[in-house]
């Protein structure tokens, strides 16, 4: 066998038939898949949640808001009425690309038709009003705000509705139930039962009152079916809500030992509805005089007024589902309220009390709610979050309109004069710019971008706070299956509060997460049943093949019904004997396969359904979490035959959160794919099933931190998800229609589409991402090539031929090496540096603004005071650096001068001023310089001035942006990781000749510590190593999907085929001595990534620099050019060694002895002996602090004479002229 070359060149080969793998075509890379389970449906578009939600807001959400706020009348309701009619979006002024370049928001003007009606005359005035520029979503699901891409993260919150909770009484051990009625907007109602059987309620978090007060009060409200209503007349109120009426309502529940309503009535001071209203008012408004009108108005506003109380569509749906659908007394069932009714009805309150009593009585079939169940938590997507903020802006605007209506004369008033758009514009700016859920997009690589758009956060307004969130809400719940990934969540304080949608999950119109399942048919409707339907409500497909039999909307007559029934029955195996009910004749026996003739005979019988052996259809239903709890669901890996029938009689299933083995006759649904449980990031980990969950979590999170490399390389061992993840990430270019490539250059692809239209795709070249990584698109199609809609036509920075490529395939050995890989450190071959295998490009942006100051305008110029020609060599005549210039720390990028404050001029200076005019005015150098530790090449310079029609902030005359590009090779101190949570820091870069090598002379690239595997329990990396070695040697790329990947037997088979040892171990030779190591070593190809934690961003050193103004100690941190903190524990270390002089230096001259440090610096420079240290400044601060508390504190010398701590530092410093240690002159303060 030829030796394995260092650069792995992979081309698809003809697969031997007996290996038993299938080709998986994705993009231009052909993979060989170990999957045994075919996906029932294709993966959905992974960012459709964001796109659909924003589209809903544009079309429906805004209309809802304008209808909700109209009409606006003046305070009297007699003069004017303003209505918002239809609206439309204009065209954006600049496209996304231009907005990014100019640093502005990608938005379109929104215009609304407004109608003003003068009520006294009936006159109508209509006009179109500009309601501000509204940020638009790009086709990738992001917003461009002030030139930066942002994402609005979906929020996972408690759904509006009623929740019942069980609490144990600590003394008696009895189960007592409480309930919370949570609206989308308005007052909460909290019901609870005490141990004396009294049911009380809190209205809007006020004092507790017996629930019968509320029941009596609402009995005086006459509700209409549409939710509107009115109070009963005064004379009737005395008769409503009496004890007898209430006892009658709940008579069927007052059984056994506990009489809840009776006990509550005993505590109730009121006797009828009128008294109850007044009592309720007293409790809710303790200081106000209780009158019947006030009480009625208050209760109506709190519970029955749609402008103040809104259950929302979801709240009403949940309320109906919880209270009315689970009705235990259908014989007296009142009609459930219509789903359009979004206010509370008296019946809802009666039902809640009824359900509480039933729960307290232990009624079978009823139980308290699980608040962490996903049936009780819903997702607020982008559209809804924006709608909520827009509502806030409109309500502020409504207040302004009402005030203006009361001031303006109706005859002269116009819609334009009344409407002030500022509150709406401010609300939207506040939301996109600063809201907790509008986040700066993580753009490190395409996966980070995709995951950010699929994130679900329980934090934010109306959600949880991380300090108060307990363990239960963070934990994995059985209802998360297929909806929220159980693996991918941050480590740290946000663990479990921030999650990611699973691969197949989607959000339904109510905001609940749904996941797809394949329908299992256990019986087939006969022809009579199909005919009874009249019209098909869904497509009908053959249960075995998935072929279309009849389309949705087809009229079903007798002939069509027979055709459908025959097609469905053919090929099925009967579960029971088929007996003709009219003659009693047995037409077919159980276990018999139905052929066409038998099917036609069965169809003629009047039987309604025919029971068949369960068959898994291609029909897919999306189920929400509470719907799923009603069904028995089998996993995707249950073995099926070629006709999609179960091979075994019993299967492992999930039912309402429990796992069980059941007969196949009880199964309702089957998972669509093994990877539907996990998110995209987790589905990219091969052999996930062999990794511990904690390490899989780290692996998922670290893939998002992988820095795009110079030459992306797709993994040899993938999972088949790489193509989909890259396609939907938004960083690659996807063809929008079928066509032929006319031209493909480095910065543009032109495609002639089949309809004759020519479409041009501009590529992004060396653009800076939000995280300073490089985005560079490269065409992967050529002239004359045919492309299909949805094909990837250009790669981005971390994709290779349309597949996600976050790292590099490297040859790894698991062995200790001179302690160089102790504690997860990584030893790396110099080849990775020399051949730029882990080299990445980073682009940083530096900007400077020339502003108007009180002393005059700043100026961008080459004419900078006290700067030599050498420092100006790379600047053009405007004072701006040339593109292509190589720069070092402290080099000038943009020359800028700022006017200095005027001082009293001497006679000579006044003379110079008179002769030369303004030229002699003092200016200071405020140029933009390269920060410490940064070096690179200038790749772009943009100059923006007011004359160029660029929107600059007030007071800014000119802005210059400079882009600086760095090429960073892998170096000691960089963090690297695999996909299994196996992370480490590069400890040393060894020469190629010192690396251990294989028997054929191939040196390994990386040496990892074998001790890092057993305790971490991420065995996936070992299996990846073995399979990677075999696949690379055979020239394949493989896909081993999660939970359905290569088995150990298959890996051994592949190793044998590649003429490699079946245990994956081989004798290695020491590169330094040439001798063989004493035992075989595991060697193979692993996909390793370089993470965004680069040593170059973290390393930092300081000799002198800025000091804190109060304590005079050096500042901390790299950003402030600070020093290293010599803390309490470090002082203990020096004390332990008795290093008194070193300790004194640390606490004085190296820190905050102001005079001492200057004198020490001077002594070092002049080569003189260092003087004794003085008093540290922080000690003086401490004395002042104590004195400020009124304590008399004195400092005494050894002979107990007071020492005067004078501020003589200034005079001492004045003597040391010219020595500046503070960095103050550089403008740090």
From Swiss-Prot:
Q: Which pairs of Cys residues are joined through disulfide bonds in the record? A: none
Q: One GO term of the cellular component aspect?
A: DNA-directed RNA polymerase complex
Which reaction is this enzyme known to catalyze? RNA(n) + a ribonucleoside 5'-triphosphate = RNA(n+1) + diphosphate
The EC number on file is: 2.7.7.6
Keyword tRNA-binding attached: no
Can you provide one Gene Ontology molecular function annotated for this UniProt record? DNA-directed RNA polymerase activity
GO annotation (BP), single = DNA-templated transcription
InterPro entries, alphabetically?
DNA-dir_RNA_pol_bsu_ext_1_sf (IPR042107), DNA-dir_RNA_pol_bsu_external_1 (IPR019462), DNA-dir_RNA_pol_su2 (IPR015712), DNA-dir_RNAP_su2_dom (IPR007120), DNA-dir_RNAP_su2_hyb_sf (IPR037033), RNA_pol_bsu_bac (IPR010243), RNA_pol_bsu_CS (IPR007121), RNA_pol_bsu_protrusion (IPR007644)
The enzyme class is transferase
Keyword terms: DNA-directed RNA polymerase, Nucleotidyltransferase, Transcription, Transferase
Question: Entry's Gene3D superfamilies?
Answer: 2.40.50.100, 2.40.50.150, 3.90.1100.10, DNA-directed RNA polymerase, beta subunit, external 1 domain (2.30.150.10), DNA-directed RNA polymerase, subunit 2, domain 6 (2.40.270.10), RNA polymerase alpha subunit dimerisation domain (3.90.1800.10)
Q: How does it associate, per the subunit comment?
A: The RNAP catalytic core consists of 2 alpha, 1 beta, 1 beta' and 1 omega subunit. When a sigma factor is associated with the core the holoenzyme is formed, which can initiate transcription.
Describe the function of this protein: DNA-dependent RNA polymerase catalyzes the transcription of DNA into RNA using the four ribonucleoside triphosphates as substrates.
Q: Record's family?
A: Belongs to the RNA polymerase beta chain family.
Protein name as catalogued: DNA-directed RNA polymerase subunit beta
Q: Which organism is it from?
A: Roseiflexus sp. (strain RS-1)
